[in-house]
């Protein structure tokens, strides 16, 4: 059996390790193996508490430097390796260790530790994939790697989860392409898409590969829908589907997907692409008719102006000065919409509509030109003189062309055209087309026809030729020409204009032509409308496809102890009718922000950076109705340190959980298609030693269990550091420290490490340099190694001299890394303050300054 629980006959050499050579020395093995097992529950509790405390220190150490480098990650990995050795069954600590080793660039360690993680969580398909991929990559030859992939994709891998095999198939496909085997690439890529519909990378690659090799619009749409199935909320894919449908004349389906794209943009709070907005309006024109489009565009802007006028009147009545009031005429349609309204009005042929549309369009363009001439506006847009000049030229060309097409203000348009013709940036073909159309509007049809035919297949030139036929009274000829344009350029403004004119002429001529969708457009519409309509519902409400629950798991006693871990149980369920990918950027978002509310007594703690992030990507996907339940460590980091240092009052902790979180005006909120929730609360009472006398604490140090000693040590820290009446005297503090130092050598390794991880070091409390000195001379290398990394603030410390570790490579490397980091003036847990830091800089992450 594999560690992943799959009954496979392993390919020879795939995962095998040399049997004659012991494993390489690692941070978790050198000098760190317990002399004897510790089956005693009390001893296991001490080890677990020490592991958790060390993990907190490692995470805090990383946070002290905004951008940790490989050395920072390596040191954190050494601490986490110690923690994982103390509690080898703690998957949360092991995951942190793997992450740190990855940041340190230790790929071999990531591979080894991932195998360990798979033993703890055999259902973790993300780790399964990583372990198998790493094993295959160990083959030196490409042919060997490809053969290994194929064995996993054959009968030997039949028990692997399909989501894992799908990604292995994709990797194999890419390897085959690298070898020049295009047929093998295509075969394995197809297998990848068939094994797991949520494999978006495979679906996207299949689209790119197969679409480039076919002119079949139906096939391209099917490939696009495959990508949509892999990620139903990818707005770029949704837009691509809308465009594919529109350019093939399948406007019913196109309208649906452009509307879906609009919905996704609104949910994400992003503006629609301007080109997509224009395309959506063309589809609107084609599905609802030119007159409907004109009426709704006009109503929208007129309603906007009416509301602006009402606001103006209300402000005026309130005494606002006239020059500060909004101008209703400043409310304009975008230039692209103005253009379409002019074209639709021309296509309909109503003179009053054309006059109004052209007048509005000219006013919009003139206002745009005036705005861009304002120097402040140019600075806001980052436009230089050249960019401004080009903007003015483009706007003039837009106005000139539409006036010519509409047959309005031809003399003014002719003057502007002459000016445009002299501009080097103006395309000569645009000039030729506009000159030909100007001749159409002036009745010079023969000359115009000659010039337009020279432009060959340009759509607007073809529209001009159809217009000439219409003006000559050749209705059926014009009708056929318009239909040809509409079929050749569906979804474009020219195609929309041509189809509208064709429909009008066909009706006038007694319907000699049957105007309907092409066979291809009908098939595409059927495919598009066959996509289940609950897809849009999923986008609008995450409750349509997932449920998320999170609860703090209460300890057996019902209340947290001072050194207990805070565990949150998370349940994520796919409630949709389709498989959904799980991950940080997948439909089921795996990133959770845990925002705690901590009440100490009756006061709510206000402290920055209490929140933490967890990633629950233990699966590549969840099938319909499948639920994943996992436990995550909720108190690793700032909250854990707060629980350790606050002893005299009871603490209540609850969390707000934000899935796929994002920042909005300085506040965190759940991301698009994501959920948020509030957990239950858990109570941690005040410490039993919070108000103990110095003699009582000294007695615990002398006779107490390791857990009692640790809790009493925290109480000592609290009472020595406080400024209140409960503060111990200097003599009492000295006596307590003496007692603790007497007990320290007699504690187990776990007990020593627990104390070293929870007590302040000498940077935070000067008197602790005595403990640090004892610890750096301890006979246990693991105790010394942790002391090096977490408690020694000076490069001249005895344990940081490489000369002390001749023959012990790991200890020497650790000493060198810590010493170099200190010399580089990096903030560390052992030395969180640097010269020049403010006096109130915390002495440890998220902790109060030392008293």
Describe each model-derived feature in a short phrase.
Residues 14-96, 103, 107, 112, ...:
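N-terminal leader/linker segments that initiate helical-solenoid repeat arrays
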Residues 88, 122-123, 157, 163, ...:
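Short coil turns that delineate tetratricopeptide repeat
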Residues 96-103, 130-134, 171-175, 205-212, ...:
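Structural detector for internal amphipathic alpha-helices that build alpha-solenoid repeat scaffolds
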Residues 503-562, 693:
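Low-complexity, acidic Ser/Thr/Pro/Gly-rich terminal tails and inter-domain linkers that flank the onset
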Residues 577-627:
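The feature marks short-to-medium sequence segments in extracytoplasmic or secretory-pathway proteins
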């Amino acid at each position: 059996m594999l560690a992943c629980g799959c009954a496979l006959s392993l390919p020879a050499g795939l995962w095998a390790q040399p049997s004659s050579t012991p494993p390489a020395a690692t941070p978790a093995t050198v000098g760190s193996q317990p002399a004897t097992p510790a089956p005693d529950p009390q001893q296991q509790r001490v080890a677990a508490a020490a592991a958790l405390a060390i993990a907190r220190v490692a995470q805090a150490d990383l946070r002290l430097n905004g951008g940790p480098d490989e050395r920072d990650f390596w040191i954190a990995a050494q601490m986490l390796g110690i923690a994982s050795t103390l509690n080898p069954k703690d998957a949360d600590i092991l995951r942190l260790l793997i992450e740190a080793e990855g940041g340190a660039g230790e790929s071999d360690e990531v591979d080894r530790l991932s195998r360990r993680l798979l033993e703890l969580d055999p259902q973790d398909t993300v780790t399964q994939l990583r372990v198998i991929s790493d094993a295959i990559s160990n083959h030196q030859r490409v042919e060997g790697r490809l053969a290994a992939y194929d064995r996993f994709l054959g009968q030997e891998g039949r028990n692997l989860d399909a989501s894992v095999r799908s990604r292995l198939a994709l990797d194999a496909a890419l390897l085959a392409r690298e070898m020049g085997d295009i047929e093998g690439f295509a075969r394995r890529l197809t297998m990848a898409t068939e094994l797991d519909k949520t494999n978006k990378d495979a679906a996207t690659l299949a689209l790119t590969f197969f679409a480039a090799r076919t002119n079949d619009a139906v096939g391209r749409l099917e490939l696009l829908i495959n990508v949509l199935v892999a990620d139903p909320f990818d707005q770029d894919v949704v837009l691509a589907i809308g465009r594919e449908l529109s350019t093939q004349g399948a406007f019913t389906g196109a309208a649906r997907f452009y509307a879906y794209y609009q919905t996704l943009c609104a949910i994400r709070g992003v503006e629609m692409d301007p080109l997509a907005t224009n395309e959506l309006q063309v589809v609107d024109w084609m599905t609802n008719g030119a007159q409907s489009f004109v009426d709704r565009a006009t109503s929208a802007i007129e309603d906007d102006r009416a509301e602006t006028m009402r606001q103006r009147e209300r402000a005026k009545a309130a005494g606002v000065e006239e020059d500060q009031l909004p101008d209703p005429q400043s409310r304009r349609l975008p230039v692209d919409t103005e253009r379409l309204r002019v074209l639709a009005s021309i296509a309909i042929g109503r003179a009053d509509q054309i006059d109004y549309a052209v007048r509005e369009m000219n006013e919009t363009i003139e206002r745009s030109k005036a705005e861009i001439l304002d120097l402040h506006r140019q600075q806001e847009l980052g436009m230089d003189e050249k960019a401004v000049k080009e903007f003015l030229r483009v706007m003039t060309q837009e106005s000139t062309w539409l006036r010519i097409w509409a047959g309005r203000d031809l003399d003014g348009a002719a003057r502007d055209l002459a000016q445009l013709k002299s501009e080097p940036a103006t395309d000569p073909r645009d000039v030729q087309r506009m000159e030909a159309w100007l001749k159409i509007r002036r009745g010079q049809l023969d000359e115009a026809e000659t010039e337009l035919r020279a432009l060959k297949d340009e759509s607007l030139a073809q529209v001009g030729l159809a217009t000439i036929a219409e003006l000559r009274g050749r209705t059926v000829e014009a009708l056929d020409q318009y239909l040809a344009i509409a079929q050749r350029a569906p979804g474009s403004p020219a195609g929309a204009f041509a189809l509208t004119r064709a429909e009008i002429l066909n009706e006038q001529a007694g319907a000699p032509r049957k105007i309907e969708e092409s066979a291809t457009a009908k098939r595409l519409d059927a495919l598009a409308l066959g996509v289940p309509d609950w897809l849009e519902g999923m986008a609008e409400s995450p409750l349509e496809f997932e449920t998320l629950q999170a609860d703090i798991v209460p300890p057996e006693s019902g209340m947290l102890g001072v050194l207990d871990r805070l565990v949150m149980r998370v349940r994520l369920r796919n409630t949709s009718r389709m498989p959904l990918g799980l991950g940080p950027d997948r439909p089921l978002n795996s990133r959770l922000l845990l925002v705690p509310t901590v009440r100490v007594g009756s006061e709510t703690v206000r402290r920055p950076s209490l929140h933490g992030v967890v990633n629950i990507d233990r699966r590549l996907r969840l099938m319909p109705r499948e639920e994943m339940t996992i436990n995550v460590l909720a108190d690793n980091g700032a909250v854990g340190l707060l629980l350790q240092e606050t002893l005299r009052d009871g603490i209540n902790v609850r969390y707000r959980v934000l899935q796929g979180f994002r920042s909005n005006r300085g506040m965190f909120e759940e991301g698009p298609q994501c959920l948020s929730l509030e957990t239950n609360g858990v109570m941690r009472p005040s410490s039993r030693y919070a108000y103990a006398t110095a003699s009582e604490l000294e007695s615990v140090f002398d006779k107490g269990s390791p857990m009692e000693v640790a809790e009493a040590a925290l109480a000592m820290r609290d009472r020595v550091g406080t400024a209140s009446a409960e503060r111990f005297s200097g003599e009492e503090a000295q006596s307590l420290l003496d007692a603790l130092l007497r007990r320290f050598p007699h504690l187990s390794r776990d007990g020593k490490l627990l104390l070293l991880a929870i007590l302040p070091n000498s940077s935070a409390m000067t008197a602790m340099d005595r403990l640090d000195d004892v610890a750096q001379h301890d006979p246990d290398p693991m105790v010394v190694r942790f002391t090096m990394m977490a408690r020694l603030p000076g490069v001249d410390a005895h344990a940081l001299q490489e000369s002390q570790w001749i023959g012990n490579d790991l200890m020497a490397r650790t000493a060198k890394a810590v010493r170099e980091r200190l010399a580089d003036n990096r903030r560390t847990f052992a030395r969180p303050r640097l010269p020049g830091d403010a006096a109130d800089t915390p002495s440890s992450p998220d902790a109060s300054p030392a008293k």
